[in-house]
Amino acid sequence: MSETQEQEASGNGEPDLPTTIRVTLKTLDDREATVTIGLQDTIQSLIDLGRREMNIQSGFQRVIAGGRVLNSTQTVQAAGISDGQTVHLVDRGPSGENDRPNVMPDRVAGPRIINAIPGLPPPGFIFQSPAFARMIPGNVEIPTPPSQTQHTVVHPIRVPGSIAGTPVLTSRVSEDCVLQKAVPYRGTSNSPNRPQAASQTVTFPSEPNVIQWTVNIADDLIFRPREHFEQVVRETINNISFLSDSTRLGVSMKWNQNCTSLSVELPPVSPHIPSPALEKLDFLCLWTDHLSRFIDKLEEHDGLVAATRHVLEMVKTRQFDQNLSQQARNQRVEALDEIVKHLEYQWAELSHMKDFERIRFRKNQTEEYRALKIQEYPETPRNPHFYMRHALDIDVIGVMREFRKQQRRFTRLEDLLDDLNEVGAVKFIRDHITTEVDYRYQALSMFYCYIQRMRHQISHMTHLTADLDVSFITPSFPQRILPQYAFQSSDEQPLTIPVTHIFEPPRMLSDVGGRYNGDYPYLAYHPPSVHMEVVLQEPRRIAEPRPQILARPTPQQFVLTQEMNQGGSINLMAATDPISGLSLQDVLRAQQEQVENLFAQQPGIEGGRVRVTARPGRRFVATTGDAPSVPVETLPPPGSDQQPGTSRRFTTHRFNVQPDARGAETETLAPFPVAIEPNELQRIAKNIASRYRAEALQRIASSLTTRFNNESWDTRIQNMPLCTLRECVAIALEMLTSAGNTVNESKDLMLALVRDEEVLVRAIAECIKSLFGRGEFPTHVARLIMPTNQTASSRNDYESVDGVEESQSDEFDSMIVRVPSDISQPQSGDLRAIRERRQNRRQFLENRGRIPSTSSAPSTSENPPGPSFNSEDAADIRAGRLPLGTRPNRRTVRETVHPAAAARAESPNHISLTFTATTHTFAPAGFPLMMASSNVPSTSAGPPGWPIRQVVSPTPTTRGLFEFDLSGSSDQPARSTPSPPAPTPRTTSAPATVQSSPTRQESMDIDSPNVQNPGHVESPAAIAARQAARVARARIDHLAATFNGDLADSRRQSPFVTPGPTTPLNDPRRRTVRVTQHVKPMVAIDPFMNCTNRHCEINRLATPTHMADGDRFTLQSLQPDQEFEARIQALVPSIERRPIQIHHEDEDYNYSIRRTQSGLLSFRNLEDFRPFVKTAIRSLLAHCIDADTLFTMNMNNISGYQAANHTELLRMVKEHISRVPGSRATRNASQNTTSVNQSTETSPREQMNRSPVQEAADPRLAFSPFPPGINLEQEVLIPGQIASLLTYLVDYMESSSNPRPPGIFGFLLELTYGRLTRHDFAQLARRTTATNVASEFEAQIRAHIRDNYLVGRTGLSNSELHGIAENLANNEQFFAIFMSQNDQLPTSFPFGYDRNDFAEVVWAFRQIEIALIKSFLTLSQLNLDSGNAVRFILQSVDSYLYRNLIMFYRMCDRDVERMKIQMKRISDYFATIRYESTDRPGINVFIDNWNRVMDYWSNRYTDFSEENFDQFLLKVRAGTDWNDIVLNESRQLLPTIASTSSQPSTSSSSLNTVSTNNPRKRNHDGSREDNDDCVDVVAPMMTSLSTSSPLTSQSSSSGTRTSSGSSGPSTSSTTTNNIQ
């Protein structure tokens, strides 16, 4: 109230208005609390009072009053809360999304949503009509729907309006008397005026249609005058009992102008929707009632059960027939038919829900029941006004009891079914049927059918009972039921898989060990309801794992042509492919050429080592077109000697930026406007493109126009606007630099493009030629960007020397073109070398007798440089079309791109071996063994092929691939055998083509047929037949290997059934898949129900990333009993869900191999190598079988689900079967951590006081490609808040009226207050500055302790120091009060080696505090330098914090989450000491600040050893004078003093071992600080001296390891924090 108002009130003699009111807060679980609050206090203060009164820990509460959510920043008076009013305190998360349960989000990309218009209800329909756009005013904003809103996805039409033309819910009227139509809600007189904010977008249909009924009534005298008619209608409406008072008042009437019709407008009725729990309860009621009537019908007199029992007695007594007449038999059959009709009628009634709610309200007519049952939801910008009906526990309990009663009755029927199965009733009756229709057999069939049908129904009912648990936590009765939704468990522990050095041992169910002849070890589980036409398909041969060789894909089909019919006989060799034009003979020639290449690579590999390199599992496919450009392997991009192109230039993690962040001004680029620190290639490209000058863009556009200015490229872009050109350059830079395998390579590519405009123009031209001409982006972009002096886009005339008739390479599609990637390959213009190599290969084949000796006719035609197309392409270009028609593809080259290995010296005795599990085409399986040995004849046949097995999968099965990549890169010479002469350099790393491979038996029998059987000569017909079979079999392999479609697409389900494998994918005969079908869960345990229950085993195994109802969870429905759930998680064993692995003593996984530091595997001889190959094959086959099992289990349509998505299946295989190992840097870091931890095990005390891990000296690990991210909240925000809290201590101590903290807290404040300024207290929040402050003031503090606490005495004994510390520490009553305020904490806990030995909590807390005080007293007596003194101070404080943390950890049963919750009770206890009462202002802010300190403490100090803590308590209880300083001095101080006696110790050498160049200066003076020392920590419990991480000076360790016999908590972020 203002002063003027107060004077007027006093002048009038009116009493003063009250300034405080009493408000009652009520929660959803019926807890109430009455608080007193001022009218000018905020709603947030009211929430805080309610949380404190009801002991609510979470901070997501809102106040609801008058049907609306109050703003927390409003005052109580402004919110309209009066004295004595009751408001609701509810839990609501920070996100306001999806406060309505059943909302269908707008996910249509095209249409838009009209925003709220003042004066009209907020619209929500999606208008797709073009005419509607003309009706919208010009000033109305039409925003696009938000893309990040996550609503509960519910199908918009849950109940159809009609089924087969019959209305379901719509009322039917007589069209002769009543005219029915629907009009928009806008324009009606009852339309409310609800202004909406312009920025709020609605996503629900808040503008419904108005159903208008026009009743034609004959005009009569009884309706005159008109006012009498209106009065009659009004009175009739008011007397209707089923209308509410608000509805009666909202009725409006209006006559038309002629007073011939009266419009009666009823107000909209707010809908009542059931809660999820009530929906489940009603379904359970409906099915329970159905189950009761079902059992009654079966058990009625002379019913189905009686007939079944009669048949059972006949079977037991072996009575074959009864002497019944035919009429009696027919009567029994008719009686059974009547039972079937009645049961089917009962099942048909399940399609309509009964009105159980009406029955419940009749039984319970109290206001309390109605208030709990119906909950009103006010209108919001997203939701209309509606009511939600809840399920109450009193309703659930009765339904549960009735269901269990009927379930026991049904159990007796199941026992009868088991009796029939035991005696074989069906077989007995079926064998003795004498009539056409036997009533006995029909009775058994009916009983079997309906019992199984009801079993499935009961399984759903049993599942619903788990969702309707009555909570036992809240004592109120009755109470609402919240369903047990599934939730994502926060399991931060990574899954540890026991592996050997290289390969993971296979699982028992998929292990091929001990199998013979390729038996499939495990029969995959097929979910129920799999369609029989899928199961009964024709068997197909499983593809066996083979090594890949140089090959090209076999054409998909061969067609009989005119040339095949020669002389009345069929010539299979003339069969041609209609797409590529190849014949079988051409394909065989191409395969023979590759076999020659294989033989040429055979010699010189004996005695070599095997090096395992990581290869990606996917393929990159590229084509080169008609005139492929020959890329040039060149030097790295140009650069100065001081800054070479391939080395790291700066340590600022910036992309080619000088330390001053200003780029040089060049002819092409403008200077850097701001400091650029890009994190992704797209941002790099946009930043670089923003610097392009206008004249440079014009020059590039002109160059590109010139390059394309010919017949085939008539594209002029030089007239484009600058903004378009800049975007084009940005996109080109992004795509071109993405070709790099690493970040450094991408940086080099960006440098080369920026420094030379000609390089950029040439690269864009080549890529556009490949992209627009053939639809594929080239994979050799890196070699296009970095040439030496020759252009890569020149015309190359490849001549066909393999084909006799064809001399021009443009029309010869079977020629194999290789893209050279080695400097030894012919360069761009060296066409003579290309012709010589091909002529030599042709001569080699003629000498081997593989092809007839004919002369080749090389072409001498010269073609101009530039893109080349044939005559058809030129015609298309003239017509304005791109050359992308339906003509067959030109010469295609498939490249398998892998990251380039590190450069090493060539050695012919080194073998680079790559094992990959992928889906490629395969070569003969005998090929790896032939490559691994020396001097193996080329005619050696491989082992027999794998047998054909039945594959239920309608999709290709999983295959395995071994890629034996021969390369000459090694830095270690062979030791076992002398090195043979080095062979001629070959293009071993060149991209290889892909061919469909022959079978094992037919791979090399054409090479030299006389070797195996000299006297045998095969006929041409036999050779042709064998080759045709070989090609057909290779075609099947090729189709299965290259299949990359969507498994969910039914058009690809079975390519071997009608309408045939050659049917186009867009053929209308192929069945399409509905988009709205749900995706089947990956783990098919209970596949017939889509379950979202949090107890469901499907969710526990699959752990989905987002559940269907995940956005509407409340705290009660997520975790009704959080402590009990945490208790269960602590007791659950940490084991894998997958099948167990094979025994560790298996001979294939029980040996060791040699591994170098660089990751290479070294073998002494071939005897060591052969077991390794066997292990590799065994592991690979097991992985293939696991993947095949996942595919088989998830690719079939089952009831209610469609086949799983192909991409999701691949993700499952990658994540759960073939897990990608970590990077080498990560593995090395973990190995270093393990070695450091092992070194510190000799000193238990050093485990607690260990320091950060020393950085490795390996230069490859000196700079990470991606700098580690900084958690701004943990590293900046929270330490800043803690610094403000420490600064507040100065203000607190300045006021003498504030109570002084007792014990250790007052002791520390007395030492620091008066010496440390506010800035010094703020410096204590971070480690780097806290050590500086301690080193500056440690001498003064130690002198103060000697003068005031030790009375100037020195040389005190340990017992005397202990006595002084006991007097300074808090007494046991201080800790007893804290324990009395927290009843959930135990008063004692076990410790030591004997678990029957208990210690009192109060006593242990006090001993920990005494130990810290005694450490400070001891330090004041020692003559130490500043560095050692600060080190001992930090170690003592760390020990104090560790021990208190372990105390809470023990009291909370080693539950980390519960420990963090209980530690916040310290904040409440401090608040009671500080404020002495709970209603003081500012107490909530005080508690929140200290809660942040507790969270920071528990998160930082996670790596502790319980063994050291037990040792401390045992020593103290035994009477030993424990002194941390004496113990640490004996271990660390004496060696340090001895080593530094000859040279004075500096703070930089004694305080920190990671940052040796950091001078001990205050960090506010601008000195440089090392990143490794920047750990922001704080010492809780008001220590004020160190709040650092436990990682201190001497010992070196990290990670989440605890010592043996201890079980300290660990989180995923511990290693990162400790390394910092």
UniProtKB/Swiss-Prot annotation:
Residue segments, region Disordered: 621-648, 791-810, 842-874, 950-1016, 1219-1260, 1537-1620
SUPFAM superfamilies: Ubiquitin-like
One GO biological process term: ERAD pathway
UniProt feature, compositional bias: Low complexity: 1537-1556, 1583-1620
Acidic residues biased stretches: 799-810
Bias-annotated ranges (Polar residues): 852-871, 1225-1242
Pfam annotation, one family: ubiquitin
An annotated GO cellular component: BAT3 complex
The organism's place on the tree of life at top rank: Eukaryota
Residue ranges constituting the Ubiquitin-like domain according to the UniProt record: 21-96
GO MF annotation list: misfolded protein binding; polyubiquitin modification-dependent protein binding
Record InterPro entries: Death_dom, Ubiquitin-like_dom, Ubiquitin-like_domsf
PANTHER family hit by this protein: LARGE PROLINE-RICH PROTEIN BAG6
UniProt name for this protein: Uncharacterized protein ZK688.5
